[in-house]
Each structure stands twice: as C-alpha cells, then as structure tokens.
C-alpha cells in the first residue's frame, strides 16, 4: 500500500530542531496541503455538502437530483452530546488550587470550548487549543481550526511537542490576500507575514508557560474522524437515494411510444418528439404505451436499508430511529443499545483527559509564577459523566430502596435530575431546620 504524505502529516515527528528556520516552516506549510484538504472535505460533509452535490449529468433533459444526507453531522453531534452533553467537573484535595482553576475555566467559557474541541476532534480526528495571556494579563485558551495548525513532535518514545505553526489567510481593504504565520516554541511566540513563498518576521514575544503553549486533543490512536471510515457508505446512500429520485422523475416524465401511425402537429408540421417526450414508429402494429424503467422497488429499498444500517454499525453510533429503541427500555437495555458508542467514547475520554491534563499543567505553570507557589497540576482530577438517556422511574425506585442503607449523598447522586448534590443536601437540611422551627413555634403557641 502506498504511504501518502497526508498520513505522515497527521502527526509530524522530526528529530529535535536546534534552529527552526524559515525554510523549514515554509516546507511544512507546503507539505500540509494534502492534510488540510482532507480536513476541509470532512468539514464539508459535516455541513451536508457531500460529494453527490458535485455530480453532473451529460444529458440536460435527464433529471439530476442531488440528495445529500446529514449522516456526518448526526454521527458527530451524537458522540459529542453523549460524551460532553454533561459538562466535565473537577475535584481536588487542594481546594485553593481547585478554586483558581475553576475561576480560570469560567473566565474562558471552558464548557463551550470543550464542546468545540470535541466536535473538531470528531470531525478531523484531532483538535488543537492555543494558550495565551490577554491584554488584561488573564490566562486564556481557545480552540483553533485544526486545518490551520501544524504541530511538530519529537521522534522519541514520549513524542513531546517541539513547536507549532498556525497559518491562516487575512484580507486587506484592497482585497489583497495575505497569509499570516505564528510560530509557537517553548520560550516565545513569533509572528510572520507569508507572501510569495517567503516569510517576513513582524515581531516576537516571550511567554511564561514553560512549554509550547499548544494542547493536542486526539480523537483516537489513528487520529481519524468519527465518520471518516464510513464516507464511502454515505456516498453510496446519497447515490442510491438520488438515483431513486431520478427514476421516479423519469416515470413522471415517461416517453409515450406510438406505433402504426405517423404523428404530425396541428399545422401538419413534423412533431417535436423530444420536447413532447414522444417516440413515433411507422410500423403496421397500431398501439400507444409509455416506455418506463422496470424498478425492483423491494430490492432497492433493502439495499438502502443495508447501507443505512452499515453506516450506523461501522461508525458505532446508535440508530435512534430503530423501532426497538423505545422510551420504555430499562437501564440495562439502554446501556446494551449504547455499547458501541460507549466503546468509542471510552477512547475519546482517555484521549481528551490527556489533553485536559496538559491544559491544566500549562495553567498551573503560569499560576505558580503569579503566586510564587509550587502547586501541582496532578492534584486536579477531571470527572466525566455520560449524557445518556435514562429510565427515570426505574432509577427513582432504586434510589428509594437504598434510603437508609447508603448515605443521602450517594442516593441523590444517582438521580439524573439532581445536578448539584451538595447544594441539594443543603436545601434539604434547611427545609428540615425550617420544619423543626415551625414545629417548635407551634408548640410554644399552644
């Protein structure tokens, strides 16, 4: 099998670079074009601009329906909703550090940023986040389009990030297209203009992250998008549905075959058979009938059903339109239906957690400089919670049966409609206190 340049560019590993030259940056940008095209194609599928939209018909008189189906968006949104529909929470024995981390994350809209990262990774196979300090000296992080980033790792077993390149187009008021390039290293950030295949340095600034301020979030070991392996099946389904639509339109505009008589227009002129969709044969057998294509509807629908099932099966996303996926399933049955999604999401969680810990490490590095402290990023623990459909009645009955057997905190944590167990316990305690006060007041009045 031929090894494509794009496969290498999904994760670039080079020997340690003492000097990052302009020639190296330009070469990496040039070699990144195939990988950039792959990502942009996947993003077009997410927007339901599938390849079927590019199909042409040589005969303009034949129908050319171009029906695309949003499987790509469905697959990505299903996984992201299941994976991060409930925001990640954090816990730590170091409450002071946890408070600083939470404040930083709130300032950066971390919940929304995580969703963006998860969607980007689901589509492209990986996502990138850039860390920086804003004009108010606040620590910031933001997801970046993966097609605009080149991250270079060393070729050791640890695969550490050596440097990263972000390149993107900007447009001047004179409609002149200019490409800007930003280089991120362990010590500084360098800004360039990129024009006529040449880099011109504009400025550079130091940073205080003690590492390259870029975080990599992999979707899986192969850095594949969630629907990338089933693109050919999506294309086949689009083609089958489009061809079916064409066939029905052909049937609606079927040709009338007239035999045994020479047809003329009302003014005795030759009839325009093409415009009138008529075939005329001057043989001895007089008859008139429509010429239609014999469609094996049953076989065609079975074929499309198989494609639909295979798309769900090989992307591991649950088919919510399955008649067996009803609202009365038990918790065990729901988990069984979601087994495939859970396998994939388990990998997603492991990879995403690795990225989160690098983000936290970079945040803590800056906090330690600001506070002159030596806090450990490993004291922060991310907690993931699946956003799965539940049988609330079943869970409530189980929780009722555990009252008095396990702690109230454990019972409340089982209920999907209780978001903050600690706050709920405080409300319950306050209600009990008010009830007791009212009882005592009533007794005194008697």
Task: Please tell me what each predicted stretch does.
Residues 119, 290-301, 342-349, 401:
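Short, charged/polar micro-motifs that form catalytic or ligand-binding hotspots
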Residues 128-222:
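Extended, regular secondary-structure scaffolds
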Residues 1-141:
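Extended, helix-rich architectural segments
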Residues 202-333:
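Extended, charged amphipathic alpha-helical segments
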Residues 1-6, 233-245, 249-252, 256, ...:
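Glycine- and charge-rich intrinsically disordered segments
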Residues 266-268, 279, 306-446:
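C-terminal helix-loop subdomains that flank or include functional centers
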Residues 18, 22, 28, 32, ...:
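Extended hydrophobic-aromatic, low-complexity segments
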Residues 93, 97, 106-114, 121, ...:
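Short amphipathic alpha-helical segments
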